[in-house]
From Swiss-Prot:
GO biological process, any: transcription antitermination
InterPro entries: Phage_933W_GpQ
Protein name (record): Antitermination protein Q
Organism: Enterobacteria phage H19B
Coiled-coil segments on the chain, per record: none
Keyword Transmembrane helix in record: no
Length: 144
């Protein structure tokens, strides 16, 4: 079973360092390359995994833009629970619950797609008893 928080952390690091993002560029035309690129200290996912997660995020944005924005603020921009609570006018506990809901929705979308991400071997969460999920074991046995 994959740990959705680790998946989103890797996606957030990828999105924060992505040069082809869909937001407005903070660098004026003609000045690209004068400012060093962001530090890549956080582990990132590969482009293929990121595109799959971006598809899930696009669907979440279409259906619930508040939860989408919350995930982007937390995982891409790195805002804290307290900063998000001030921004949304609620408690940090409420932010935690909303984040958990948004993470669950993205995890459900990934399960419905039935895709195997390249980062799965790094983000596997052990089940009680030290086992990995049956889904993961079955996928690995098919590859052998």
């Amino acid at each position: 079973m994959r740990d959705i928080r680790q998946v989103l952390e890797r996606w957030g690091a990828w999105a924060a360092n992505n040069h082809e993002d869909v937001t407005w560029s903070p660098i004026a035309a003609g000045f690209k390359g004068l400012i060093p690129e962001k530090v890549k200290s956080r582990p990132q996912c590969c482009d293929d995994d990121a595109m799959i997660i971006c598809g899930c995020m696009a669907r979440l944005n279409r259906n619930n833009s508040d939860l989408h924005d919350l995930l982007v603020d937390y995982y891409v921009l790195g805002e804290t629970f307290m900063a998000l609570a001030r921004k949304h006018g609620c408690s940090d506990t409420c932010i935690g619950k909303r984040l958990h809901k948004a993470e669950g929705i993205v995890e459900g979308m990934l399960m419905m797609l039935g895709v195997r991400l390249e980062m799965d071997r790094y983000v596997e969460r052990e089940l009680p008893g030290g086992r990995t999920s049956v889904f993961y074991q079955r996928k690995n046995s098919l590859r052998s």
